Amino acid sequence: MGSKTPDGHRQGPNESSTGGTIAVLNPPKSASASGLVQDASGEDDEDGDDDEEKAGTDLNSRAQPNNDGKKRKRKNNKKKKKKRPLSGQQTTPPRVALSSIFSGQRYPEGEIVKYVTNDDNLQRTTAEELRHLSVVNNMDDTFLSDYRQAAEVHRQVRRYVQTIAKPGISMSELAQEIEDGVRALTGHQGIETGDALKAGLAFPTGLCLNNVAAHWTPNPGTKEVILGHDDVLKIDFGVHVHGRIVDSAFTVAFNPVYDNLLTAVRAATNTGLKEAGIDARIDHISGEIQEVMESYEVEINGNLIPVKALRSLSGHNILRYKIHGEKQVPFVKSKTTQRMEEGDVFAIETFGSTGKGYTRDEAGVYGYGLNEHVSATGLRHASAKSLLKTIRENFGTLVFSRRYLEHMGVKNYHLGMRSLISNDIVECYAPLVDVPGSYVAQFEHTVLLRPNCKEVISRGDDY
């Protein structure tokens, strides 16, 4: 594209006929005739001053009288030399090739704006994909072996427990039998430092009676509770091998009045297991569970009471050394976009109640769990620091109870525990109850979503 010729620029004699005409009408004069002298430096105007401008200057200088008798200095009208651009700098207007300015083709960066980390739409790999990759990578050569070992321990222990869970037994005795059995069968007593993290109990043994839905365990120094004929008892305990947790629960009742309640909950759990699978929508599974559960009724004292699915509890996925993951499987129809994925491990459990179907926290302590995202730098009490060290070395992110601490020989831990709880370093879990006079039942299994099949790892011939 042609560019406009700058003003005052004279073309060469071979470039234009106009330039030739000017040369004829105004023939060039010698330097002495024109009165033009060279610069003190001896340099001529390299740009070539216009002849007309030189002549005009000469005439003006002659016309003006010299009053002081001295030769007046002629004003220098020469144009300033164009400065050549320094190396690495651009001209104005820009005409220097960038390759001459930026060595090695290293050009300036633009504005760097980091992606918002919690916006999956702006990330190449979404949080869901990262979670899936983490789960799949977790399925190493020992994955199935560890899970099957933990499941077999659970089956053998609960088979014995079902023979002794009869009216008249205390909850403390029943819990001790379960915990002793798990420690014996895994080969890890959990007394030496770090031994409980290799294999053993995955969380406090749950022994919940009647309207107590979940999270109750006998604690040292509390009033003894005895199992009665008209009680509905939920037995929920977990076994882990190298952090692979098997979570399974069942309900026992001796009065046939509650048979329909147990049947409803067992059927609902089996429905959840049937619908579970890779890419299964969790909202669909929840809807199917609720439909089956709430199709049952229980007759108590001549009154037909519909079985209600608990709305404040849910099934959940299981992570290594973490009983509760990020996914939940409610027992009622819910709006969620979550799906089950290959490599997921789920605890499919259901709770059915003759009460309101909602739970609330009750006074008491079920267990404790370390909050790994909270810093402990602000701890001042030596007892709290010592207890925190014990928790990290022996339980990590596993939930534990007072009974587990005392089994290891830990004493005088109450003050330190209060300090850890008040600083949010340790979470405290309370029992969950429905309305008084109601009855709640529970059944639960752990299922592995393997690439080519699902394996209900805790299934036995009992339930």
From Swiss-Prot:
Binding positions for a divalent metal cation 1 per the UniProt entry: 236, 247, 444
Pfam families referenced in this protein's UniProt entry, alphabetically: Peptidase_M24 (PF00557)
Residue stretches of biased makeup (Basic residues): 70-85
Binding, a divalent metal cation 2: 247, 316, 349, 444
Cofactor note as given: Binds 2 divalent metal cations per subunit. Has a high-affinity and a low affinity metal-binding site. The true nature of the physiological cofactor is under debate. The enzyme is active with cobalt, zinc, manganese or divalent iron ions. Most likely, methionine aminopeptidases function as mononuclear Fe(2+)-metalloproteases under physiological conditions, and the catalytically relevant metal-binding site has been assigned to the histidine-containing high-affinity site.
Amino acid composition bias (Polar residues), ranges on this chain: 58-67
Subcellular localization: Cytoplasm
Single GO term (MF): initiator methionyl aminopeptidase activity
Tree of life domain: Eukaryota
Keywords assigned: Aminopeptidase, Cytoplasm, Hydrolase, Metal-binding, Protease
Residue stretches of biased makeup (Basic and acidic residues): 1-12
Primary enzyme class: hydrolase
GO cellular component terms listed in the entry, alphabetical order: cytoplasm
Recorded catalytic activity of this chain's protein: Release of N-terminal amino acids, preferentially methionine, from peptides and arylamides
GO biological process, one term: proteolysis
Binding site for substrate: 215, 324
Renumbered residue ranges of the record's region Disordered: 1-96
EC number(s) from the headed UniProt entry: 3.4.11.18
Ranges of biased composition (kind: Acidic residues): 41-53
Stretches of the chain forming a coiled coil according to its record: none
Cofactors that this protein relies on: Co(2+); Zn(2+); Mn(2+); Fe(2+)
Annotated function: Cotranslationally removes the N-terminal methionine from nascent proteins. The N-terminal methionine is often cleaved when the second residue in the primary sequence is small and uncharged (Met-Ala-, Cys, Gly, Pro, Ser, Thr, or Val).
Family (UniProt): Belongs to the peptidase M24A family. Methionine aminopeptidase eukaryotic type 2 subfamily.
HAMAP family assigned: MetAP_2_euk
The protein's name in its UniProt record: Methionine aminopeptidase 2-1
Species this chain originates from: Arthroderma otae (strain ATCC MYA-4605 / CBS 113480)
